[in-house]
Design a protein with these regions (language model features):
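N-terminal intrinsically disordered/low-complexity leader segments
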Residues: 1-16, 203-205
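Helix-turn-helix
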Residues: 20, 28-62, 66
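Alpha-helical DNA-contacting segments of helix-turn-helix folds
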Residues: 29, 63-71, 79, 112, ...
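Amphipathic alpha-helical linker/stalk segments
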Residues: 69-93, 123, 132-133, 138-142
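Hydrophobic alpha-helical connector segments
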Residues: 80-108, 148, 157-161
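Amphipathic alpha-helical segments used for helix-helix packing
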Residues: 103-125, 170-178
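Amphipathic alpha-helical packing segments from all-alpha helical-bundle domains
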Residues: 121-147, 155-160, 183, 187-198
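Amphipathic C-terminal alpha-helical segment
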Residues: 162-180, 195-204
Length: 205
């Protein structure tokens, strides 16, 4: 085996180990939640040392961020698939798609918002931008529904609406004391969007 072949073999093994570590971390988060995730458990499941995990991702935060990036990508893919022909139906579709994703991937989505960097380090800019891009998907339909509003106000309203939808869904799925009953989440989300838009003066279709 020449040097090029040996290097290629090492690269393949490295990629396989990285993929395995990500999959194990994702599976553990999905089943038990982020707070139960331990680097030792990931390393043991992958039959490697803790040092190998750190070498691959820099630190444990690096592994969690990698899983969270993939979660945002999957969420955004689902949201962008919502038809955009009618802005009101699009907003309802975005809320419905978010509910579906949250119900199917509750712990993974929760991990995205629960994760705190070690030593209060700032989050990498790329994942912040990815999350903001997902939130911004409500911006385009709101612009169409509120054409006379200040663009900066509409951008802020889009973030506020997405935050409200996220909060309603998160509390509802966790069945918190003040939450909307899970069985009525879809119905009451639709009512919230209609009521909120009416308060903003958006036309009814």
């Amino acid at each position: 085996m020449n040097n090029v072949q040996e290097e290629s073999r090492r690269d393949r093994k490295k990629l396989q180990r990285r993929t395995l570590l990500i999959e194990i971390a994702r599976r553990l988060i999905a089943s038990k939640g982020l707070r139960s995730l331990k680097v030792r458990d990931v390393a043991e499941a992958a039959s490697c040392s803790i040092g190998s995990v750190y070498n691959e991702f820099g630190d444990f935060d690096g592994l969690i961020l990698t899983v969270n990036r993939e979660t945002v990508q999957a969420l955004t893919a689902g949201l962008t698939a919502v038809p955009a022909d009618d802005p009101l139906r699009q907003l309802h579709g975005l809320a419905d798609a978010y509910l579906g994703f949250a119900a199917e991937h509750a712990n993974l989505l929760r991990a995205l918002f629960e994760h705190r960097m070690e030593d209060d380090r700032p989050f990498p800019e790329d994942i912040l931008a990815m999350v903001m891009d997902a939130f911004a998907l409500m911006h385009a339909p709101l612009v169409r529904l509120l054409p006379d509003r200040d663009p900066d106000d509409v951008a802020l309203l889009a973030r506020m609406m997405f935050s409200a939808v996220h909060g309603i869904i998160s509390l509802g799925l966790e069945e918190r004391m003040v939450a909307v009953p899970p069985a009525r989440l879809r119905e009451l989300l639709a009512q919230f969007i209609d009521t909120h838009l009416a308060g903003l003066g958006a036309p009814r279709s």
